[in-house]
Amino acid sequence: MSLSEQVLAVNDDLPIRTDKPVHSGKVRSVYWLTEEDSRRLIKEKGYNVAPDAPLAIMVISDRISAFDCIWHGEGGLKGIPGKGAALNAISNHWFQLFKDNNLADSHILDIPHPFVWIVQKAKPVMIEAICRQYITGSMWRAYTNGEREFCGIQIPERLEKDEELADLLLTPSTKGVLKGIEGVSEVDDVNITRKDIENNFSAFNFSSIEDIALYEKLLKEGFAVISKALNDIDQIFVDTKFEFGYVNDAQGNEKLIYMDEVGTPDSSRIWDKNAYRSGHIIENSKEGFRQFLLNHFPEPDILLNKNRMDERFALATENSLPLEAMMDLSKTYLDIAAKITGAPIMLSDNPKAEIIKVLKEQYQLVD
């Protein structure tokens, strides 16, 4: 089987029984189950959710997204071998660790296949919960341009690139484009202050103003748990993005949970600790791929300037990236996943066929 056939690039065409449109994101696709199938699985599998809770099948792909574009490689390679399974395995590992440390639950109810989660529908908090322990990336670029206030927080002068910050910095941004919120620009991923959230907590989908402190607590606790575990395997947790939402448990009680993925090479920066101590940065995350793209194309401003999105999409569509770059990234994902989970990631020969088989035979979700 060829390399391109091992990659799951298209994940929104599976014959999963649903009566709603499939939601296809940059990396994951979501199939909302029928009310009948949701109720049946909750009863059969004993999921700790309300009997009428809507469930979904979430299928990850191997697609690679960077700078808001999907990239492809030479030879018809439409994704990164092993990426989807690696991301899910890492998230599964951290969510279990959160549970072991008595943190909040996640939206995941079941894991039928390395590419698949069965999830409970949640009401999302409309915030990208970003936190930073080091000054790097976009924050460093803004700092070099003279910015000293980030999301309402003043940071000191004379910081150096990639320096550890004295405290974990919470720098939230909007999740999508939010309209009608005073002082918040109607664009995607705009930075917001805690005051913005407090003044408009219901617009950000918080159930109460007190839950702002709860989300911050869960963000800090989750970061600390992952940071300690990564430190134990000589890695540094540099920065990350969490997402949160509300669900009801089996008794009908509303609770704030972790959503999406956590602590992955896509949602975080992870550095090699020993290299950092000797003054070098070795990226064990997607950041290395972003740096490759910035160096690969003659006009990196196209990738950084949101006013040049048409040019950026054309760049991603019209250019096949070197196979070596795609495979280097594959190695990054597979290696860091093996370090974190303690087990190698097994590559599927035909992930799509495997997914259909397990959902048909064990969950009766394919006709």
Swiss-Prot record:
Q: Which GO terms describe its biological process?
A: 'de novo' IMP biosynthetic process
Is ATP-binding set as a keyword in this record? yes
Q: Which biological pathway?
A: Purine metabolism; IMP biosynthesis via de novo pathway; 5-amino-1-(5-phospho-D-ribosyl)imidazole-4-carboxamide from 5-amino-1-(5-phospho-D-ribosyl)imidazole-4-carboxylate: step 1/2
Keyword Cell inner membrane found: no
Q: Name the enzyme's class.
A: ligase
Q: Which UniProt keywords apply?
A: ATP-binding, Ligase, Nucleotide-binding, Purine biosynthesis
- One Gene Ontology cellular component annotation? cytoplasm
List residues traversing the bilayer: none
List its EC numbers.
Answer: 6.3.2.6
User: Which InterPro entries does the annotation name?
Assistant: SAICAR_synt/ADE2_N, SAICAR_synthase_Vibrio-typ
In this UniProt entry, which cysteines form S-S bonds?
A: none
Quote one Gene Ontology molecular function term.
Answer: phosphoribosylaminoimidazolesuccinocarboxamide synthase activity
Family listed: Belongs to the SAICAR synthetase family.
What catalytic reaction does the record list? 5-amino-1-(5-phospho-D-ribosyl)imidazole-4-carboxylate + L-aspartate + ATP = (2S)-2-[5-amino-1-(5-phospho-beta-D-ribosyl)imidazole-4-carboxamido]succinate + ADP + phosphate + 2 H(+)
Put simply, this protein is called: Phosphoribosylaminoimidazole-succinocarboxamide synthase
